[in-house]
Amino acid sequence: MSRLSSLDRLLWELVEIPSINPSLECKYADFTGEERIAQFLEGKANSSGIEYRRMKVLPGRENIVIRLKPAGKIKNKVMLTPHMDVVPATPDAFVPKIKNGCLYGRGACDTKGSIASFFHAFLRLAKERNRPKNTEIIFVGLVDEEFGQAGSRTLAQKGPRANLAIAGEPTNLKVVSAHKGNLWIKLSTKGKAAHGSTPQYGRNAINNMSPILDTLTNEYPKLLSERKHPLLGSPTISVGTIRGGSQPNVVPDSCEIDIDRRTIPGETDESVKKEIKNLFRKLKIKSPEFSATRSVPCPPLDTDPSLRIVQSFLKASNRRRTIGVPYFTDASPISMGGTPALVYGPGNIAQAHSKNEWVSLKEVEKAEQSIFRFLSNLE
């Protein structure tokens, strides 16, 4: 490890620190919580003489906010907002390994590669004499991205607000200005239980669900394909779970499905529910009961790529245009709070949550250089 660059060493140390989201099922209780990462970042800020504070989010879980003041009066603000939590893994996943130019370990890709590149650039700029004259740079380590995004939602509610936020996620160093929203809906049908030998005396709730499933998997996607966003394409629908009945010889009196509806800008949770109900009505299908399975909104992200500060980041990252992605990130809650947000970072989303998660050290280095160039050129 002594031969590693300061950036690679920072990533190694971050991956070594377990930070499994405690809201997710995990049998290794000692490996849960973001507090150790927050303390680690706090220590780095303290030794560099940089101002920091905590932001309470959930019991025992806090965002860490580290602020780099400009040389003059604050006129603008930029936030770097990677999340500190990771998904569950076995203890050996927190023993980093480097092979063929890649660092392996839980969170290497999602998203400690982003923490390392963002925070290293932040600390490097703090040592520079010529820091931005009027732009405050704020590094925020967020909790709970992997579950309910409580960290970014609290940041959006309490502030600070900024001219731009960059949420750290594995984007292969592409600049993301749009992503789909996410709506989970439970649909339920009712029936009447009866003995399996005399089904005529019951009403089969699974049979009642059958035309609903057929509509959601065949007719509804055709309707959605007619609607497109320039960066995101069409919205999607997926039936993720189904539950019904207790045993083969009993006519089921209830059936439930959970659907995952990915939304594009212009759609709302209510408009989606109304659209599905109208489709059932049009096809003369008895509508099931609708209930949301999430208590917080997850709308799509749609940041204007023509914003001057977005164009500045594109130039710093050597990209000509922004892209869209189908998955949900902290950028959406942050943008809901009034701060335009992008998504950016080293690594491939295909590696996120995988058993042998890894990130290219070369990509981490390139991300750090892009962030540093961007921050250095701020006014």
Stretch-by-stretch model annotation:
Residues C102-S117, H195, Y344:
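Glycine/serine-rich anion-binding loops at beta->alpha junctions
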Residues T111-K112, A116-W184, E379:
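Acidic/histidine-rich catalytic neighborhood of metal-dependent amide-processing enzymes
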